[in-house]
């Protein structure tokens, strides 16, 4: 009987894999068939839903300052960079005032556009905000945003949400070397593998991500990119 146990586990695993693959394919089809131009009219509603629930901590962190748009961000910091830096988890010189310490560990980060300023919230390994950086107009006018090739984990994360998600590298100007982040036209953390389970939530996340890109580009032409849902 023991000889059959590995076979049973393999059969169960394959069955689950095919089930999830089929489920994800159906969800992606629903997302791909969405009229995003019509959905974009709901951007303010979707942002409010997020900020009143899962992302309510961003409202607390911003205090009295308004939130025009927001997005998730991840470090562009791979294994090679970690080895080169001697496995450091901090990097100096990443702010607008003085010398502070910016996490290079793969923790979630949040971008909030408020007026002319872009706020970057860095989190610790417990998911709590432990640093708050503000990039003003002068910094943002000298920053860059470019589309990047879809490969590896970046590609996997984007394609899990249909055909309308693109990835970008945002290089934010500082006194020293730029802060380089990976962002998407959707609410995604590159290094937190997550399988979308609700097509409507995916649509909402895509609208919020595109709204962030649009507002950032409208305010700063040097940070303007074509919106995937309109191309």
Model-derived segments and their meaning:
Residues 22-24, 32-33, 42, 52, ...:
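Detector for Asparagine
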Residues 21-111:
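Anionic N-terminal interaction surfaces
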Residues 97-167, 178:
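Phosphoinositide-binding peripheral membrane targeting modules
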């Amino acid at each position: 009987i023991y000889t059959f146990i590995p076979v049973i586990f393999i059969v169960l695993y394959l069955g689950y894999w095919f089930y999830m693959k089929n489920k994800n394919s159906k969800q992606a089809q629903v997302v791909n068939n969405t009229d995003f131009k019509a959905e974009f009219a709901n951007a303010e509603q979707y942002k409010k839903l997020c900020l009143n629930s899962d992302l309510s901590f961003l409202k607390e962190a911003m205090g009295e300052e308004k939130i025009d748009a927001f997005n998730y961000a991840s470090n562009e910091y791979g294994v090679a960079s970690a080895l080169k830096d001697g496995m450091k988890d901090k990097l100096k010189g990443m702010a607008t005032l003085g010398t502070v310490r910016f996490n290079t560990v793969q923790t979630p980060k949040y971008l909030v556009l408020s007026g002319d300023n872009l706020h970057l919230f860095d989190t610790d390994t417990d998911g709590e905000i432990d640093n708050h950086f503000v990039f003003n107009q002068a910094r943002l006018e000298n920053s860059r945003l470019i589309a990047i090739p879809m490969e590896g984990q970046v590609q996997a994360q984007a394609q899990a949400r249909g055909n309308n998600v693109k990835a970008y590298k945002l290089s934010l100007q500082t006194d020293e070397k730029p802060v380089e982040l990976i962002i998407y036209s959707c609410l995604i953390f590159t290094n937190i593998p997550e399988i979308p389970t609700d097509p409507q939530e995916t649509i909402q996340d895509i609208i919020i991500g595109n709204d962030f890109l649009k507002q950032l580009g409208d305010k700063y032409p040097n940070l303007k990119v074509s919106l995937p849902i309109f191309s």
